[in-house]
Structures are given as structure tokens and as C-alpha cells.
UniProtKB/Swiss-Prot annotation:
Subcellular location: Nucleus
Location of the RRM domain: 24-102, 221-299, 417-489, 535-618, 640-723
Chief location bin: nucleus
Record-stated family: Belongs to the RRM MRD1 family.
Region (Disordered): 105-139, 151-191, 617-637, 740-769
GO biological process: rRNA processing
Protein's name according to its UniProt entry: Multiple RNA-binding domain-containing protein 1
PROSITE patterns, alphabetized: RRM (PS50102)
GO annotation, cellular component aspect: nucleus; ribonucleoprotein complex
Keyword vocabulary terms for this entry: Nucleus, Repeat, Ribonucleoprotein, RNA-binding, rRNA processing
Job of this protein: Involved in pre-rRNA processing.
Length: 769
């Protein structure tokens, strides 16, 4: 059952403010007193235009003839208000509908108003008492004088008390005199005396005192939110609270029996000040039609009352197993595990090098020592080529399983139910992977390629996926440590999962047929061999909603029609989808038919857009695609030069040549080196290289195959090289030559000026191949 605070319900009944600001919560006034909740809810959903609205909360008070209704967002509430306001839809009188406004923030004056009035009353009371007591003292003094008897002679006790009272009065007068500010000296000016006077009157400013709840928030940076709608997701809640600061974690508990949300959430902020600001601003405000109740959140279980021997590193409590380990290593391990869910820490297709070598060696029927023979001198290249082979097999398997490979990019939104399992040791079976993740929740999909080096696990519930991610991140499996990463959104082509385990043969054939059909559709249609040259028209100004089938249907009635297509490009926001480029081509069997169609189609409207038609130039189509949509393989130009970044400094020219020559013939290879030699006397490489292939196809093949490959543990970053980059390298080389030559010159200052224009070439820089 939904837990609601008694104080929150009473506050909502007591205060019913309305306003002009659009909110997701409405108040209905002047309702019939005989209206029941079921009839009220059915009436709200009865209009056809309001059937799609989502009601998150209803509270009807028939005796007072008003009701509160909450909706998913302000747009839905606006539609309902416009429909029911001023109508007689519920029977009885005219109904008034308005937005419920948030409770105004309490100011300091309102908070202290009661305290100030209380102090004022107490002060007035003390003054009255003193006024009442003063006449009594005078009366006693008058009566003692009028007795005519010496008080000291009549009563020794009275004389003693009188003497003590005199001393006490003198001491009080002396104290009052000492408390008075000293008179200004003669030589002091009026401004100095005024400053001393004001400082004495004002005193020290009082520091604001924090409540216990605020102190708890500042210590934990955590908030507990309740009274949420059941449709609330972690994304929507994080988006609502993230306006006040970065949120590291958003946890929405669900019922263990039904799997339904409980209407509560825990929010972990990165900064404690941001959490306190969100607590003050969003408590008792409206979100998705319900009044939020924000409370301070306690620390996570396991972080409270940490033992004295276990420290806290970056907010993470180190357990007993961290005792005795190095301080630096413990910090690194704790921070890495804590930040594992915040971003992408590894390449999407990262694989264990030992598992790759074992997989390839097992297929070849040899041992790993024979594969990675130290005497051969190219073990790193062999391992990189083996990793490339395994990655190609893995990509092919994932394509057959319905995974969009274009979605495996580092900067894309991450799914809350899909987990990439990396660094798996060789020999791990799909059953062992299922047994590892199944205890944390219901699985809908488990994929493991034949090489067994990378897996994909999908949960039915995002809460189970988050629990498994926290429990299994950096956990040891066999002789390796698991690296987990949240899968990208839109990773699978279809929402329906094929189930746990490998896909069936029938499903595999269906996926292959579907993939083949999509591949055929993506290929440019070739005109009939009998078509004459110059019989293709270029259509410009197409509507971006116009598709190829629709264009074919419209133009197929033209005599001599051969083919028609709309030029498409990949959608960067939705992997696997395509966008129209706004132009297309239509082919005819003869040039005469194309000429007639040119005259007929000029200015013709398709989907509300007027066409611009002209003859297409043979061979110019690819150039036009390259300029507007970009070449999927070659970037902006059909270049044959590749820039390789993130090369390890230990890599030699021989290693790079052997690695890339497996995919094409290299025309040239340049591996720039640093001008200043190292302590050993050798010139270290600068971490990048330029490669030139004989053809663009070979260069594209190498880039596609090696873009996920690691060489000596470093991920190779491949880009198309521009001519300007090589010119910059040459200019930098000449600049370094001039600097060194200027440093070596002796004599006066004029002769030691640096020559940035370069001079006679020498071999000191080692940049030439």
C-alpha cells in the first residue's frame, strides 16, 4: 500500500491555493455532494479526447464539494481544464476547474513572527511586574522612615540587611556604569565615536542554526522522496531533481512479490549543498499530479557505523578485505567500483587478451605459447590480429542476434536493463553466465558469442539490473575480473527478446532474411543495362517524409519508368534508422523518356513540396552523397591515408606495418619520433602514425577491422588523415630543426635567434621514414 504522511494529507486539505501557473494537479470546485469516486473518475475519462490522459491521483471530498486530480504532466491537465471548466458535466451546478499552485516558501519573517511576538509579550509582562513591584519598595521605605525608631537599634538583622542592600545597590550601579560605553576622548572625532557606538550596540551577528534534517542531508547527500506516482521512472525523477545539481544515483524500490513500484525513491547527489537546495525547493511541490514529500535520506546500508579499521574513501566504505592492503590500491579499487555505473570506462568490445589468445590457439589446435612465441618478435601483432578476428566473429554473431552495432558508441544514452559483460575468461559457458546473473532478477536475454569473450545480459526489470550491476561489478570470475558496462539505448532491433540462451535455427533464419532484405534495400538500385546513358533524373526538394515506395508509386505511371529512390543516410540519434536527405533519383529506359519526364516533373508537387528536376551526371552521385550525407567509410573524401592515434610508445614501425598490411598493401608508413632523445639515447615515438594504402577500399577495410583492436594494451584510434595534417607535421619538423640549430649556434644574442623557417635538412629529428 502507498505510504502517505498524515501531516501531508492534513496540509493538503487545509490549504487549497489556486493560481494561473500551469501545474499537473487540478482542483474541481462546486461538485455535487452526491458524487462518488468511481463516477467521478469515469466522467473524467469519458470524453474521447481525454481517454489517453493518465490520472495519477484523485481525492474527492463530497461534503465540501471539491476534489483534487493529478495528471502525468501539465499538458494533460491543461486539456482537462479546458474541457471541464465552466461545464455541467458532473450534474448540478457549474463546475470551476483551476490549477493547484505550490505552497509558497516560508520566509524568515514568517518563521520568526511567532517567536518575536512571544518575546514581546514576555518583555511586556516583565515590565508590568517591575512596575508593580516598584511602588511596594517605596512604600516599605516610607513606612520604615515614619516609624521613628532607628532600624539599626531596633533590629540588628534589619541593619545587616540594609547594609548588604546598600552594598548590593552600589555594586549594581558600578556594574551598570562599567557596561556604559566610555566617553570619547577629546581628540577623537565624531566618526570614530559613532563607529564605536554602533559596534557596541549591534554586537556580533548571529549565525543561522541548521536543523537536524538539514545536518543529516549535508552529511549523506541523500534524499528520500515519497508519494510518487506509480508511473514515475528513474529518468523522469532524475530529470526533475537534476536542475539543482548532479545526481549520481536514483533508486526506485519495487515490491518483491508483485514487482510494482512502491511510490518512493532515493536520490544520491554528488554535492551535499545541491541536495539541501533540492530539499528546500521541492518539498511539498507538485510532480506528475502528486504532492512530493521530500525527507532526508539515511546513508546506505553498510556505510553506517563503519569499523574503526575500515576507512571511507570518496564516500565508499572499505570492507575487511581491504585491511592490510596498500592505501593507494584501496583508494583506486574503491573509486573504480563506485564510479563503474557513472560512465563508460572501457571500449564497448573490450576483450581479455588472455581469453583471445586461448580462443584462437584452441581453434588452431596449438598452445598459447606457440601462438605467442617470444622468439618471433611480433607477439604483439599476432595478439592484435587474433583480437581482430575474434571481434569480427563477435560482431557477426551480434548482428544475427538482432543487435545494432552502430549503437555501440561511447557517447549515447545508456539502457537501465541491458548490461555488457566484458573481460570474460575463455571457457565460460552461457549457462555459467546465466547462473551468475539469475539470482539478482528475471532475465529476458543472455547472449554469448562462440569465442566466449564478451556477453550481453538483459533483465526484465531495471531494479534487478541495477542490483546485479552493483553486486557483480569487478567481481572475480575464474582467473579474470568482470568489467560491466550498461548497454546503449536501442541496442536491439526488436523489443521482443528471443529468450535466454542462443536463438533458435528458425529465428536465426528469419533474422538473416530480414537483415538481407534491409541490406538489399539500402543498396542503390542499378538501372537496367539496356537503359541509355543520360536517362537518369536528379530530383531536388523532396519532402523529408517522402519514402522510396511512395516515390515509386507516384512516378511509376510515367512511360519508360525504370526505377526511383530517395537518398537516405543513417540517423545519428536512432541507431538502425535512416533519414531522408531531401533528394532522389528516377531512371528511365531511354533518354527521350527522361527528357519528356523532365518537362512534366518540373514544378510538380509531391507531399506538398515542389520539385526541381535536372539530368543526373554519371559518377556525381557518390560525390553528392559524400558532401551532404558523408561517406560511411571514407568520411568527407575518398582518401587513402589513415591517421593512427594512441599508439604505444614501445610500438615499432615493423609492428605497425605487419598489423595493417594484413588488410591491404601499404604505400607508405610514417612513425614520427620525438626530437629530444630519452635517457637511453633512443628517440621515442610520439604516439601516432600516418599510413597510406594503395586504394581507398583497402584503407576502409583496415579501419573497419581494426577500430576496436588493442596493440600492447592500448586501444587504437583510427581516423582519415587530411593533407593539412601532414603539412602541419612538416612545418613542426622544420620548426624543431630551426630551434635546435639556434641553440647550437654560439656568439652574440643575434646569432642565437631561433630560426623558425628551417634551413638545411639534417637527420637529427628522425621524422623521415
Amino acid at each position: 500500500m502507498r505510504c502517505r504522511s498524515v501531516a501531508l494529507v492534513w496540509r493538503e486539505w487545509k490549504w487549497r491555493g489556486v493560481g494561473d501557473k500551469r501545474q499537473s494537479r487540478l482542483i474541481f470546485l462546486n461538485l455535487p455532494s452526491t458524487l462518488n469516486p468511481d463516477t467521478f473518475r469515469k466522467t473524467l475519462l469519458s470524453p474521447a479526447t481525454l481517454k489517453s490522459t493518465t490520472i495519477t491521483d484523485t481525492k474527492l471530498v463530497p461534503k465540501r464539494r471539491f476534489a483534487f486530480v493529478g495528471y502525468k504532466d501539465a499538458e494533460e491537465a491543461q486539456k482537462v481544464k479546458e474541457w471541464f471548466d465552466g461545464t455541467y458535466a458532473f450534474g448540478g451546478g457549474k463546475v470551476k476547474v483551476d490549477f493547484v499552485k505550490d505552497e509558497p516558501l516560508k520566509t524568515g519573517d514568517k518563521l520568526n513572527r511567532g517567536e518575536k511576538s512571544k518575546e514581546k509579550r514576555s518583555k511586556e509582562g516583565r515590565d508590568n511586574v517591575q512596575e508593580k513591584q516598584e511602588p511596594n519598595k517605596r512604600l516599605q521605605e516610607f513606612m520604615s522612615v515614619m516609624k521613628g525608631v532607628d532600624p539599626a537599634m531596633a533590629s540588628p538583622e534589619a541593619s545587616t540587611s540594609t547594609a548588604e542592600g546598600t552594598k548590593k545597590e552600589k555594586s549594581v550601579k558600578g556594574k551598570e556604569k562599567s557596561e556604559e560605553p566610555e566617553e570619547a576622548e577629546a581628540d577623537d572625532d565624531d566618526a570614530a565615536w559613532l563607529r564605536r557606538r554602533q559596534a557596541a550596540l549591534e554586537g556580533e551577528p548571529s549565525t543561522p542554526q541548521l536543523s537536524a534534517d538539514e545536518q543529516l542531508i549535508l552529511s549523506t547527500s541523500r534524499l528520500f522522496v515519497r508519494n510518487l506516482a506509480f508511473i514515475t521512472t528513474s529518468e523522469s525523477l532524475s530529470s526533475h531533481f537534476s536542475t539543482y545539481g548532479r545526481i549520481d544515483e536514483c533508486h526506485l524500490p519495487v515490491s518483491q512479490t508483485t514487482g510494482e513500484p512502491l511510490g518512493t525513491a532515493f536520490l544520491q547527489f554528488h554535492n551535499a549543498e545541491d541536495a539541501l537546495a533540492a530539499y528546500k525547493a521541492l518539498d511539498k511541490t507538485i510532480f506528475q499530479g502528486r504532492l512530493l514529500h521530500v525527507l532526508p535520506g539515511r546513508a546506505k546500508p553498510g556505510q553506517e557505523g563503519a569499523a574503526a579499521g575500515s576507512g571511507v574513501v570518496d564516500g565508499k566504505v572499505l570492507g575487511k578485505r581491504d585491511e592490510g592492503r596498500g592505501e593507494v590500491k584501496s583508494k583506486v579499487d574503491a573509486k573504480r567500483k563506485q564510479e563503474s555505473a557513472k560512465g563508460v570506462n572501457w571500449a564497448s568490445l573490450y576483450m581479455n587478451s588472455d581469453a583471445v589468445a586461448a580462443s584462437v590457439a584452441d581453434r588452431m589446435g596449438i598452445s598459447k605459447s606457440e601462438l605467442l612465441n617470444a622468439d618471433s618478435g611480433n607477439s604483439a601483432v599476432k595478439l592484435a590480429l587474433a583480437e581482430t578476428t575474434v571481434i569480427e566473429e563477435t560482431k557477426k554473431y551480434f548482428e544475427e542476434a538482432g543487435i545494432v552495432l552502430e549503437s555501440l558508441q561511447p557517447r549515447v544514452p545508456r539502457s537501465q536493463t541491458t548490461i555488457l559483460v566484458k573481460n570474460i575468461p575463455y571457457g565460460t559457458s552461457i549457462q555459467s553466465l546465466t547462473d551468475l546473473f539469475a539470482p539478482h532478477g528475471k532475465l529476458t536475454r543472455v547472449l554469448l558469442p562462440p569465442a566466449g569473450t564478451l556477453g550481453v545480459v538483459e533483465f526484465e526489470n531495471h531494479m534487478d539490473a541495477g542490483r546485479a550491476f552493483k553486486a557483480l561489478a569487478y567481481r572475480r570470475l575464474g582467473n579474470a575480473v568482470l568489467y560491466l558496462e550498461k548497454g546503449p539505448v536501442g541496442m536491439f532491433k526488436s523489443e521482443t527478446a528471443p529468450g535466454v540462451g542462443p536463438i533458435s535455427t528458425e529465428q536465426k533464419r528469419e533474422e538473416e532474411a530480414k537483415a538481407l532484405a534491409e541490406k538489399v534495400e539500402s543498396l542503390p538500385e542499378q538501372p537496367d543495362p539496356t537503359d541509355e546513358a543520360g536517362s537518369t533524373l536528379f530530383l531536388k526538394g523532396l519532402n523529408f517524409t517522402t519514402t522510396t515506395p511512395h516515390l515509386q508509386t507516384v512516378l511509376s505511371h510515367i512511360p519508360g519508368f525504370s526505377f526511383a529512390r530517395v537518398q537516405m543516410k543513417p540517423d545519428p540519434k536512432r541507431p538502425g534508422e535512416k533519414l531522408s536527405m531531401g533528394y532522389g533519383f528516377v531512371g528511365f529506359k531511354t533518354k527521350e523518356a527522361a527528357t519528356k519526364a523532365l518537362k512534366a516533373l518540373e514544378g510538380f508537387e509531391i507531399d506538398g513540396k515542389s520539385l526541381e528536376v535536372k539530368f543526373a551526371q554519371r559518377g556525381a552521385e557518390d560525390d553528392r552523397e559524400t558532401k551532404k550525407g558523408g561517406d560511411a567509410e571514407g568520411g568527407k573524401t575518398k582518401s587513402t591515408k589513415v591517421l593512427v592515434k594512441n599508439l604505444p610508445f614501445e610500438a615499432t614501425k615493423k609492428d605497425v606495418r605487419e598489423l595493417f598490411s594484413a588488410y591491404g598493401q601499404l604505400k607508405s608508413l610514417r612513425l614520427p619520433r620525438k626530437a629530444v632523445p630519452t635517457s637511453t639515447g633512443a628517440q621515442s615515438t610520439r604516439g601516432f602514425a600516418f599510413l597510406e594504402f594503395t586504394t581507398h577500399t583497402e584503407a576502409a577495410r583496415a579501419m573497419e577491422a581494426l577500430k576496436h583492436t588493442h596493440l600492447l594494451g592500448r586501444h587504437l584510434v583510427l581516423q582519415w588523415a587530411n593533407e593539412g595534417e601532414e603539412v602541419d607535421i612538416k612545418g613542426l619538423r622544420e620548426k624543431v630543426k630551426g630551434e635546435v640549430r639556434g641553440m647550437e649556434d654560439g656568439g652574440d644574442r643575434k646569432r642565437r635567434k631561433l630560426d623558425f623557417k628551417g634551413g638545411k635538412e639534417d637527420e637529427m629529428d628522425g621524422l623521415e621514414v
